[in-house]
Design a protein with these regions (language model features):
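Glycine-/small-residue-enriched transmembrane alpha-helix faces in small-molecule transporters
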Residues: 1-50, 94, 139, 156-182, ...
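Hydrophobic alpha-helical transmembrane segments of multi-pass integral membrane proteins
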Residues: 19-23, 49-65, 137-140, 164, ...
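Loop-to-transmembrane-helix transition segments
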Residues: 19-27, 71-94, 160-169, 217-240, ...
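Helix-helix packing/entry segments at the starts of transmembrane helices
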Residues: 22, 54, 108-113, 180-199, ...
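Hydrophobic/small/kink-forming positions within alpha-helical transmembrane segments
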Residues: 32, 85, 89, 93, ...
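C-terminal-most transmembrane helix of multi-pass membrane proteins
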Residues: 56, 262-312
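C-terminal transmembrane-helix exit sites in multi-pass transporters
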Residues: 62, 67-70, 114-139, 266-286
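Hydrophobic transmembrane alpha-helices of multi-pass small-molecule transport proteins
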Residues: 63, 133-151, 283-302
C-alpha cells in the first residue's frame, strides 16, 4: 500500500514520503467513519468503554498465533516496543474513554491539540527547531479544530476529569509518535503486536478505575451476537489502519503525522452530516478546509526544504 505513488528519490526524506502520507490520510479518514460501526455495536449491547476493550483484546488474540509462530521460527515474540505500545495504547484508550466523562466537543478539542505536543517533544527530544511552515500548519490546524468544535467560544482548558483524560490522550499519542521517530522500528509486526498487548493492559487497568462510568458488562448473548462483527471489524479495519498509523511516524516524521491524523475530523464531520441530521454549516466547511490546508502545507513545504538541502 505504501508503494502507490511516485518514489521520492530526490529528497532526504523517506523514498515513499508522499505515498505514506497519502496512506495515513486514508487511514485517518477511515477512523472518521468508525462512528458508524460503533453505533451498531452500541445498539447490539456493547456500550460504554466495553467497545474500547474489545478493540484492543480481539486484534491481540488474532495476532497471537502469528507471534507464537515467529517465536517458533527463531524471531522475536513481538513485544519489542513496550514504551511505544503503552504510550500509543494509552492515548487511544484515554481518547475513547474521555467521552464517558466529558462533553464530546471538549474531548475532541483537548485531544486534537496533539500537534502542539508533538512539536514540543520534537524540540526537546529530537533537538529540532520548528521551521517557519510548522507555525503556519499549527495555526491552520488548531484554528480548523476550534472553528468546527468551538461554537460556544470554548477555550481548551481542562475543567474536569474527562477533560484531563482527553488532554493526556493527545500527549500520549504525540509522545508515542516522537518515540517511533527516534527508535525507527524495523518491521511492522512487533510494533503492532506491542500496541495491542501493552495498550490492552492499559485499557483494562483504566477500565477498572472507570468502572462506575463504564456501564454494566454486556451479557453473554450480546458478546456472542456481536463477535462475528467484532472479528470482521478487527480484521478489515483495526489491523490494516493501525499498520499504516503505527508505521507512519518513523517514516514521515511525528510532526506531519500529528497534522494528517486531523483528517479524521473532516471525514467524521462530513459523514455525520450526510448520514444523520447533525449540523453541517459554514463552521464545518471552513474548519475542515483549514485542516486540509494545514496537512497540504506541511507535506509540500517539508519536502521542498528537503530538496533544497540536497541541492546545496
Amino acid at each position: 500500500f505504501f508503494l502507490l505513488y511516485h518514489k521520492d528519490v530526490n529528497t532526504s526524506r523517506h523514498p515513499y514520503h508522499y505515498s505514506i502520507s497519502f496512506a495515513l490520510l486514508i487511514a485517518a479518514g477511515l477512523w472518521g467513519l468508525f462512528w458508524i460501526p460503533q453505533r451498531a455495536l452500541e445498539s447490539g449491547g456493547l456500550t460504554g468503554g466495553w467497545a474500547t476493550i474489545s478493540q484492543m483484546v480481539i486484534p491481540f488474540l488474532i495476532l497471537l498465533p502469528v507471534a507464537m509462530w515467529r517465536k517458533y521460527k527463531g524471531s522475536s515474540f513481538g513485544l519489542d516496543y513496550p514504551v511505544i505500545g503503552l504510550l500509543f495504547g494509552a492515548g487511544i484508550a484515554c481518547y475513547a474513554n474521555s467521552f464517558l466523562l466529558t462533553d464530546v466537543v471538549r474531548a475532541l478539542i483537548l485531544f486534537y491539540i496533539t500537534p502542539v505536543w508533538t512539536t514540543i517533544f520534537e524540540m526537546i527530544f529530537l533537538r529540532q527547531v520548528p521551521r517557519y511552515y510548522r507555525y503556519i500548519t499549527l495555526i491552520l490546524a488548531l484554528s480548523g479544530v476550534w472553528i468546527v468544535f468551538g461554537q460556544d467560544g470554548f477555550i481548551p482548558i481542562p475543567q474536569n476529569s474527562g477533560d484531563w483524560i482527553a488532554l493526556l490522550g493527545g500527549i500520549f499519542i504525540a509522545a508515542s509518535a516522537v518515540r517511533m521517530e527516534v527508535k525507527k522500528p524495523e518491521g511492522i509486526f512487533p510494533i503492532l503486536f506491542s500496541f495491542f498487548f501493552y495498550g490492552g493492559i492499559f485499557t483494562l487497568v483504566q477500565a477498572y478505575f472507570l468502572r462506575d462510568v463504564m456501564g454494566s458488562a454486556p451479557s453473554l448473548d450480546s458478546w456472542l451476537t456481536m463477535m462475528p462483527w467484532l472479528l470482521l471489524i478487527a480484521i478489515l479495519f483495526h489491523l490494516p489502519t493501525n499498520v499504516v498509523i503505527l508505521g507512519a511516524p518513523s517514516r514521515i516524521g511525528a510532526g506531519l503525522f500529528s497534522i494528517i491524523i486531523l483528517f479524521e475530523i473532516v471525514v467524521g464531520t462530513f459523514s455525520a452530516a450526510i448520514l444523520t441530521d447533525e449540523l453541517f454549516g459554514w463552521r464545518e466547511i471552513l474548519g475542515s478546509s483549514f485542516i486540509i490546508l494545514a496537512g497540504l502545507t506541511e507535506i509540500i513545504f517539508a519536502s521542498n526544504v528537503a530538496i533544497k538541502k540536497n541541492n546545496l
